[in-house]
Amino acid sequence: MSLAFGWAAVILLLQTADTASAVTTPHDKARIFADLSPQEIKAVHSFLMSRKELGLESSKNLTLAKNSVFLIEMLLPKKKNVLKFLDEGRKSPVREARAIIFFGAQDHPNVTEFAVGPLPRPCYVQALSPRPGHHLSWSSRPISTAEYDLLYHMLNRAITPLHQFFLDTTGFSFLGCDDRFLTFTDVAPRGVESGQRRSWLIVQRYVEGYFLHPTGLEILVDHSSTDVQDWRVEQLWYNGKFYNSPEELAQKYAVGEVEAVVLEEVVLEDPLPGATEQPPLFSSYKPRGEFHTPVTVAGPHVVQPSGPRYKLEGNVVLYGDWSFSYRLRSSSGLQIFNVLFGGERVAYEVSVQEAVALYGGHTPAGMQTKYIDVGWGLGSVTHELAPGIDCPETATFLDAFHYYDSDGPVLYPRALCLFEMPTGVPLRRHFDSNFKGGFNFYAGLKGYVLVLRTTSTVYNYDYIWDFIFYPNGVMETKMHATGYVHATFYTPEGLRHGTRLQTHLLGNIHTHLVHYRVDLDVAGTKNSFRTLKTKLENITNPWSPSHSLVQPTLEQTQYSHEHQAAFRFGQTLPKYLLFSSPQKNRWGHRRSYRLQIHSMAEQVLPPGWQEERAVTWARYPLAVTKYRESERYSSSLYNQNDPWDPPVVFEEFLRNNENIENEDLVAWVTVGFLHIPHSEDVPNTATPGNCVGFLIRPFNFFEEDPSLASRDTVIVWPQDNGLNHVQRWIPENRDCLVSPPFSYNGTYKPV
């Protein structure tokens, strides 16, 4: 075996170990989907560090000319082996880790991925090959903390000539030793072609909400080399004009040839108790303005007087007829597996694949920004959730452990939450009027859902990820976008690309797109894809032949190959998207699940246009493919920094145009929305209206609504004596936390 880093001897050829053990509970079997424990991460890290051939160092060493472990996460076994284990009682697949190593301490630096196993006691390491025809370029690697530190130190030195310029125009400095210092936000892609690592940096004042405080200066830095001495500032842009060096800008400023903008004074508030309170910055979360709701009255909140109705066994969630396993993948985010309803598998996997935000702007950084968030650690920036704000106080909070750009597992406390909540709308209800001022009966089923939630804070933006489970076999996937807008310095020309939000602030136009993998297994793995739509027919009225009648009829389309089931933006997407089993329900219909997409996304880049190759999935609101192990992920950690030659190109999944009739199918779903920033996005984008997602809904899968099994139903029957009979199947619980006793009248009459 020949490897790029030139040390084939490190591969230990070891036979697959038998790690099967006694399985007694759902938790035991579901461990196959569980993230690595801290002990497993440490075992993998220690094993790799012990391999002298690798020459590994700490990731924190301030050099890029080193070999270091960047990421360790669970490596998912092959689906066929997992199903044999889950469904047929075969032995458990070997548990392995995926490890990414940056090999910078050699003549030709490279990035290599490995499988390390078996866990919990690893003794072999094997290189993982990229998809055929692709490679992992050194320039495509994500930026590490060490590289950011080196970049900041280099920038500090390079822009020393601008010290007075910064003090005069911003009141802040890179060289300051007080709390009035400058920072930067870098954008990507990093250059204009494969192999480059040239980043535009937006210089900002480091205050609360610094994303909204650009100074007007943007700096282009070439940091391609592993030797920091080779790094250099290539260009600067200030207030609409380009400069070749910091020295040129400083010299022209000194002689009055720069159209300088002096920013308004920022009063920094002392956070210590007793300090004089200052007016909050416009970018601050601190309340201001009139608030007409009484502050002495707390808002409503969720209570659980009798405790939770769901169960958590390890990484398995049990709720009513639902059961599923969850995982928080460090590289890409939240995933659920083995989704069962009533003991029958509905989906093998539903997972976040990628999130992108594609911008326009007048400044070089604004026009360059095309964020591909897996390249920024989308799954690892899952910071603590606040009880009562991010999740109800009654939620079960779950920790996560990530090894991402570190030297060991890092604890992210309360990174996920799990909770049941009332929806505020009944799942079903009916008032059966007698049309005489009374009723025959009233019936309703209380609306409750179970929610699994996490967030990803990718620098300025916060994504809230939800998987929602309803008692009628419906599962919903949602993404809410919030956080600070990505903003640049205001110039009049910038109004073509955004909105002026403050004196010197432009909120840049952008489109959010999120990609999901939905591996539906509807009553088995042999499924077909079809759509239903209506078509109007004009017929002679059979009971009045002299008249015509127009009515809708059903029109079904069956899709036999992948190309037919790849729907491009701009093409009409049928409303009823059905994944069907050959099995039929009692009424003769194929047992199916419907995919219902809620999105306002549009295509944002021309197909084949430069960086678009990294996000070819964004051509399709829906594409259906045959399951392949080589097509597990639609993006990668590397697509951001080498979008011109990415190692994962989704379009290639469709090239072989495979048969999709009675096959194991995967739906790839793109959702998103255009965001034109507006003044109400200050200080933050709010969640209402900035939510997209999809549902999977049973469609003739059952013989009737499975929520009939719920005991949350209430039926009211009128009685002649005036006292209505309330029929319920769960006793009305009475204590200080419960609502007033249930009552229902049902009459209506003139007054």
Curated annotation (Swiss-Prot):
<feature type="binding site">
    <location>
        <position position="510"/>
    </location>
    <ligand>
        <name>Cu(2+)</name>
    </ligand>
</feature>
<feature type="active site" description="Schiff-base intermediate with substrate; via topaquinone">
    <location>
        <position position="461"/>
    </location>
</feature>
<dbReference type="GO" id="GO:0048038">
    <property type="term" value="F:quinone binding"/>
</dbReference>
<keyword id="KW-0479">Metal-binding</keyword>
<dbReference type="Pfam" id="PF01179">
    <property type="entry name" value="Cu_amine_oxid"/>
</dbReference>
<feature type="binding site">
    <location>
        <position position="656"/>
    </location>
    <ligand>
        <name>Ca(2+) 2</name>
    </ligand>
</feature>
<feature type="glycosylation site" description="N-linked (GlcNAc...) asparagine">
    <location>
        <position position="538"/>
    </location>
</feature>
<keyword id="KW-0472">Membrane</keyword>
<feature type="binding site">
    <location>
        <position position="521"/>
    </location>
    <ligand>
        <name>Ca(2+) 1</name>
    </ligand>
</feature>
<keyword id="KW-0801">TPQ</keyword>
<dbReference type="GO" id="GO:0005615">
    <property type="term" value="C:extracellular space"/>
</dbReference>
<feature type="binding site">
    <location>
        <position position="664"/>
    </location>
    <ligand>
        <name>Ca(2+) 1</name>
    </ligand>
</feature>
<keyword id="KW-0964">Secreted</keyword>
<comment type="similarity">
    <text>Belongs to the copper/topaquinone oxidase family.</text>
</comment>
<feature type="glycosylation site" description="N-linked (GlcNAc...) asparagine">
    <location>
        <position position="745"/>
    </location>
</feature>
<feature type="binding site">
    <location>
        <position position="512"/>
    </location>
    <ligand>
        <name>Cu(2+)</name>
    </ligand>
</feature>
<dbReference type="Pfam" id="PF02728">
    <property type="entry name" value="Cu_amine_oxidN3"/>
</dbReference>
<keyword id="KW-1015">Disulfide bond</keyword>
<dbReference type="GO" id="GO:0005507">
    <property type="term" value="F:copper ion binding"/>
</dbReference>
<comment type="function">
    <text>Catalyzes the oxidative deamination of primary amines to the corresponding aldehydes with the concomitant production of hydrogen peroxide and ammonia. Its preferred substrates in vitro are the diamines histamine and 1-methylhistamine and it could therefore play a role in allergic and immune responses. Has a broad specificity for diamines and can also act on cadaverine and putrescine, two products of amino acid catabolism. It could also act on polyamines, like spermidine and spermine though less efficiently, and regulate various biological processes.</text>
</comment>
<keyword id="KW-0358">Heparin-binding</keyword>
<keyword id="KW-0106">Calcium</keyword>
<feature type="binding site">
    <location>
        <position position="658"/>
    </location>
    <ligand>
        <name>Ca(2+) 2</name>
    </ligand>
</feature>
<feature type="glycosylation site" description="N-linked (GlcNAc...) asparagine">
    <location>
        <position position="61"/>
    </location>
</feature>
<feature type="binding site">
    <location>
        <position position="519"/>
    </location>
    <ligand>
        <name>Ca(2+) 1</name>
    </ligand>
</feature>
<feature type="active site" description="Proton acceptor">
    <location>
        <position position="373"/>
    </location>
</feature>
<keyword id="KW-0186">Copper</keyword>
<dbReference type="InterPro" id="IPR015800">
    <property type="entry name" value="Cu_amine_oxidase_N2"/>
</dbReference>
<dbReference type="GO" id="GO:0005923">
    <property type="term" value="C:bicellular tight junction"/>
</dbReference>
<protein>
    <recommendedName>
        <fullName>Diamine oxidase [copper-containing]</fullName>
        <ecNumber>1.4.3.22</ecNumber>
    </recommendedName>
</protein>
<feature type="glycosylation site" description="N-linked (GlcNAc...) asparagine">
    <location>
        <position position="110"/>
    </location>
</feature>
<feature type="binding site">
    <location>
        <position position="520"/>
    </location>
    <ligand>
        <name>Ca(2+) 1</name>
    </ligand>
</feature>
<keyword id="KW-0560">Oxidoreductase</keyword>
<dbReference type="GO" id="GO:0009445">
    <property type="term" value="P:putrescine metabolic process"/>
</dbReference>
<dbReference type="InterPro" id="IPR016182">
    <property type="entry name" value="Cu_amine_oxidase_N-reg"/>
</dbReference>
<dbReference type="InterPro" id="IPR049947">
    <property type="entry name" value="Cu_Am_Ox_Cu-bd"/>
</dbReference>
<keyword id="KW-1003">Cell membrane</keyword>
<feature type="disulfide bond">
    <location>
        <begin position="391"/>
        <end position="417"/>
    </location>
</feature>
<dbReference type="InterPro" id="IPR015798">
    <property type="entry name" value="Cu_amine_oxidase_C"/>
</dbReference>
<feature type="binding site">
    <location>
        <position position="653"/>
    </location>
    <ligand>
        <name>Ca(2+) 2</name>
    </ligand>
</feature>
<keyword id="KW-0325">Glycoprotein</keyword>
<dbReference type="InterPro" id="IPR000269">
    <property type="entry name" value="Cu_amine_oxidase"/>
</dbReference>
